Design a protein with these regions (language model features):
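Amphipathic, non-transmembrane alpha-helical secondary structure
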Residues: 18, 22-26, 77-81, 98, ...
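Internal anion-binding site segments
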Residues: 203-324
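Internal alpha/beta domain cores that form substrate/cofactor-binding pockets in large enzymes
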Residues: 9, 32-35, 64-83, 88, ...
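Donor/substrate-binding cores of folate-linked one-carbon enzymes
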Residues: 27, 87-213
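N-terminal Rossmann-like dinucleotide-binding module
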Residues: 1-45
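N-terminal beta-loop-helix "entrance" segment that forms/cooperates
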Residues: 40-61
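Structural motif corresponding to alpha-helix initiation and N-cap regions
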Residues: 18, 51, 73-77, 94, ...
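A residue-level signal for conserved active-site and pocket-lining positions in enzyme catalytic cores
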Residues: 12, 34, 58, 88, ...
C-alpha cells in the first residue's frame, strides 16, 4: 500500500502534538480526520472559547476535526467509523477506550516522550530532568488496555545536557518525535510490525521509574536536599509549572516565590540551610547542606518573571528573609 492510500486518523491536543501532525501532512500522508479536545472556555467569565493547538493547525490545513466530550459516545463512534481509518496515531491526547483504539485494521500507536518502559505516565519529560537523567527519548508503541504498556515499535534517544530544562528537552523531543511518527508509519506500510513487549526491557518492576502527573505541592522545593538535586528539580519544572518556595520574613510573613533558573555551587560552609546571601546587586545564594544554590530567574506572586538584577533592584530587604 502507498502512503497516499493509508487512511490515518490523528489524535492530539497540545503544541507537542502539532509537530507530528505537521510532519504527516507535509510528508504527503493521508490524514482523513483529527480528534482533539473540546475548545476550552477562557477569559473572566469563560465567554471566549480557546481551540487546542492541534485544532488550530488542523483547521489551517483544511483537515476535518472532531471534538468529542466523551470517547464512548455513540454519535462520536459513528463519526469515527465513518472515517474508515486504517491506522490511528495518538500524540499527547487522553486515554482511549478499547472500542476506539481497536477500531482500525492496523491498530493505534502512541508517541510517548520517554524511553519506555521508563517514565510511564503523564509527565515523562519533567521527571527525566528532575531525576538528573543524562538521556531520554521518544517511543512509539501499540495501545493496549493498560496505559503506556503496549508493545514497542521503535525508539529514538536524546541526550540531556546539565544545562537543559523542560522547555529545551520538550522542544527537542517534539521534533524528534515527529520524525519517529513518520518512520513508524512507513514501517507499518512495509508490513514490519515486529513490536517488542515492554517486559523484555526490564527484569524487575522495581527498575521502572514512574512519571505521575505533577501538582502544585509536587513543585515545592525541599531545601534539605543536596544542591545537585535541587538544581535538577528546578530545571525539571522550568518554565512550567515552575518550582516554588516561600520567602519567610523575621516576623513569619510568607510570600510565594517561583524559581526558574539556578546555578549549583558546591561548597563547605556553616550557614543554616535556607539562609539567603547576597551582594544586593548581582547575586542571591541560598545555603543548602553541601553548598549554595544561586538564583538567576525568579517571580514573586502577582509579579512578572525577572532576572536577578531587576529582582534585587525592587527587593532591597531580601537578606532579611529565609526560604522554606
Amino acid at each position: 500500500m502507498k502512503k497516499e492510500d493509508l487512511r490515518i486518523v490523528y489524535m492530539g491536543t497540545p503544541d507537542f502534538a502539532v509537530e507530528s501532525l505537521r510532519a504527516l501532512v507535509e510528508g504527503g500522508y493521508n490524514v482523513v480526520g483529527v480528534i482533539t479536545m473540546p475548545d476550552k472556555p477562557m477569559g473572566r467569565h469563560g465567554s471566549v472559547l480557546q481551540p487546542s493547538a492541534v485544532k488550530q493547525y488542523a483547521v489551517s490545513v483544511g483537515l476535518p476535526v472532531l471534538q468529542p466530550e466523551k470517547l464512548k459516545d455513540e454519535a462520536f463512534l459513528e463519526e469515527l467509523r465513518a472515517l474508515r481509518a486504517d491506522l490511528q496515531i495518538v500524540v499527547a491526547f487522553r486515554m482511549l477506550p478499547e472500542v476506539v483504539w481497536n477500531m482500525p485494521r492496523l491498530g493505534t500507536f502512541n508517541l510517548h516522550a520517554s524511553l519506555l518502559p521508563q517514565y510511564r505516565g503523564a509527565a515523562p519529560i519533567n521527571w527525566a530532568v528532575i531525576n538528573g537523567d543524562t538521556e531520554t527519548g521518544v517511543t512509539t508503541f501499540f495501545l493496549t488496555h493498560e496505559i503506556d504498556t503496549g508493545k514497542i515499535i521503535r525508539q529514538k534517544h536524546l541526550p540531556i545536557a546539565d544545562t537543559d530544562d523542560v522547555e529545551t528537552v520538550h522542544d527537542a523531543l517534539m521534533a524528534m518525535g515527529a520524525g519517529l511518527v513518520t518512520e513508524t508509519v512507513d514501517l507499518l506500510l512495509d508490513g514490519k510490525t515486529d513490536a517488542i513487549p515492554q517486559e523484555e526491557f526490564y527484569k524487575d518492576v522495581a527498575e521502572l521509574r514512574p512519571a505521575p502527573k505533577i501538582f502544585k505541592d509536587t513543585c515545592h522545593i525541599d531545601w534539605n536536599q543536596p544542591v545537585k538535586k535541587i538544581y535538577d528539580f528546578v530545571r525539571g519544572l522550568s518554565p512550567y509549572p515552575a518550582a516554588w518556595t516561600e520567602l519567610i520574613s523575621a516576623d513569619g510573613k510568607r510570600m510565594v516565590l517561583k524559581v526558574y533558573q539556578t546555578e549549583k555551587r558546591p561548597a563547605t560552609h556553616n550557614f543554616p540551610v535556607g539562609s539567603i546571601h547576597t551582594d544586593h546587586k548581582s547575586y542571591i545564594d541560598v545555603a543548602v547542606e553541601d553548598g549554595f544554590l544561586r538564583l538567576h530567574s525568579l517571580q514573586l506572586a502577582g509579579k512578572k518573571r525577572m532576572n536577578i538584577t531587576d529582582f534585587l533592584n525592587g527587593f532591597k530587604q531580601i537578606a532579611e528573609y529565609t526560604v522554606g
